[in-house]
Amino acid sequence: MILSRRTFLKGSAAGLAGAAMISDLAAHLASAVPAARVRVGARQGCFGGTFEAAKRCGLDGVEIGVGGPAEKLHIADPAVREKFKKDVQATGVVVSSLSMDLLNGNPMPTDPQAPAWLEQTIDAAKDLGAVGILVPFFGKAHLLAGKEFKKPETDALVERMKAAAPKAKDGGVSLGIECTLSARQYLELLDRIGSDAVGAYYDIGNSAGAGLDVPADIRDLKGRLTMLHFKDGGNYLGEGKVKMEPIGEALKAIDYKGWIVLETSCPSKNAEADGKRNTDFVKKLMGLSA
């Protein structure tokens, strides 16, 4: 089972009182959104960007980028995080996750700075109360050559994720590997890493576009999913090529209770209106109150 911040807190000696280990803000956020249901978040470009807009859309959380390559990441700056904390406190919308998009051009397995960036991001996630980190592998960072893993890169990735996993677990943060992989490939990789702090960040749009059986993958990845990205090219959810109802059924079948993060487009060019439309669709799909 993938580690969640709520699981981390419940495992402490005094429940939420033990949240002092991860900061007062994290304690507040751990109880801000019920863990007994799916939560809906979005990347900043999918709804208008501000936490106020996210609240108007009915979102529970926002996925935030960590910034571009630098010795010290943007998100590692306490002043940057303080602004996000104020946004959270003002709106009740939490930081669901941090996205390390810079790793697509500076791959986790090979870039000498990548382990330090991951450590900085874990510290930032812990401070912000974010439960997950997106560790992506696209473009030159993709883990596959054809249908097979790139052996040197994958071997290096396994070692680096093994090294980072204890810090993530101690902070109550899950590391989500996002790459267009089948469930079988994900499980092979995750079994090699061997930590419940590392799981699959599954993108339904990318996977459907690659011809994968998304509902079957979701069922096979029960207990190994950190989060999911929902998108369908340039379409509103439910109106494109991705068949959403079987995906919703699969998530219910595995009793998924984590985050669904929108990575949707804006067909009308009104980001907030489109963000609300897609949020409402996901809530209806998953049987959540609007």
What are these regions (language model features)?
Residues C46-G48, V66-G68, D101-N104, F137-A141, ...:
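Active-site-proximal loop/turn and secondary-structure-junction residues that shape catalytic pockets
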Residues P34, V38, S96-G105, K140:
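N-terminal small/glycine-rich loop or linker at the start of catalytic domains
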Residues A76, N106, A145-F149, D232, ...:
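Short amphipathic alpha-helical segments at helix-loop
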Residues E63, S97-S99, L134, G176, ...:
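Conserved beta-strand positions in the central sheet of alpha/beta enzyme cores
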Residues I2-G41, G48-D60, T91, G129, ...:
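Histidine-acidic metal/acid-base catalytic patches
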Residues A76-R81, D111-L118, K150-M161, D213-D217, ...:
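Charged helix-capping and loop-helix junction motifs
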Residues A13-A14, G18-D24, G41, F51-K55, ...:
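Active-site acidic/histidine proton-transfer and metal-coordination neighborhood
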Residues G65-K85, K140-L144:
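Glycine-rich, proline-tolerant flexible connector loops at the mouths of alpha/beta enzymes
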